Amino acid sequence: MVKVGLVDDYRVDLEKLEAIVSRMQDVEIVFSTDSAKEAYRRVKNGDIDLLLADIEMPHMSGYELADLIKSHSLDVDVIFVTGHGGYAVHAFDLNVHDYIMKPYYADRLAASFDRYLKKKTETSLNGRILIKQKSEMHVLQKKDIIFAERTGRSTTIVTTAEEVQTYQTLNDIKGDLPEKDFLRSHRSFIINIHYIKHFSAYTKHSFTVSFEGTSKKAMITKQQLDYFQNYYF
């Protein structure tokens, strides 16, 4: 089921969009609003997978909204549905899924959703990571990794189900993990932001990190904690 948000300051266009999307299979409209600021609040809460947005809106444009989504590494795709063609080149700089011009037909929107669903399926197949050891290999679900710690020449990966040791470095592992979910919190740690429970001061420039799912703790520098607060909230 794809969870969708709709935002357009023009009520007639918003109602048309609602009518078309509500008839699609495996799609749930989570919210429909005329405010880009309200849409951004819902996006930050992790309420949706896909946002359909007009561009020219008061207070915050759809372009500004998509830019915030990208710059904060939020896991939401965007389809622009707009009457203005002049933003197309800049829109794709933001890696939006599609750019649909008004007036449009339902078939055009349905085709865009079909491409999105295909992309989503392909992406889900890439949700695993291969961790190498000297004599064996482990296949882990990325979403199950809580954190990884480098100690000496060994890296320990703590998951919701087990701990795995590997000779692979944090740099090797970080390259295979999505930036929107994993943060290099310290020279010795990579953490999954979705399992964070709280931070405790450790030194003037560092904090310990506690997680859901394990009693083990990681470290985060003050600089990276500031980054976490600014870019993930």
Swiss-Prot record:
It is found in: Cytoplasm. The modification 4-aspartylphosphate is found at residue 54. Keywords: Cytoplasm, DNA-binding, Phosphoprotein, Transcription, Transcription regulation, Two-component regulatory system. GO terms for molecular function: phosphorelay response regulator activity; transcription cis-regulatory region binding. Phosphorylated by NatK. One of its GO terms (biological process) is regulation of DNA-templated transcription. CDD domains: REC. InterPro entries: CheY-like_superfamily, LytR-like, LytTR_DNA-bd_dom, Sig_transdc_resp-reg_receiver. One of its GO terms (cellular component) is protein-DNA complex. Residues 3-117 form the Response regulatory domain. Pfam families: LytTR, Response_reg. Residues 129-233 form the HTH LytTR-type domain. The keyword Cytoplasm applies. Member of the two-component regulatory system NatK/NatR that positively regulates the expression of the natAB operon. Acts by binding directly to the promoter of natAB. This is Transcriptional regulatory protein NatR. It comes from Bacillus subtilis (strain 168).
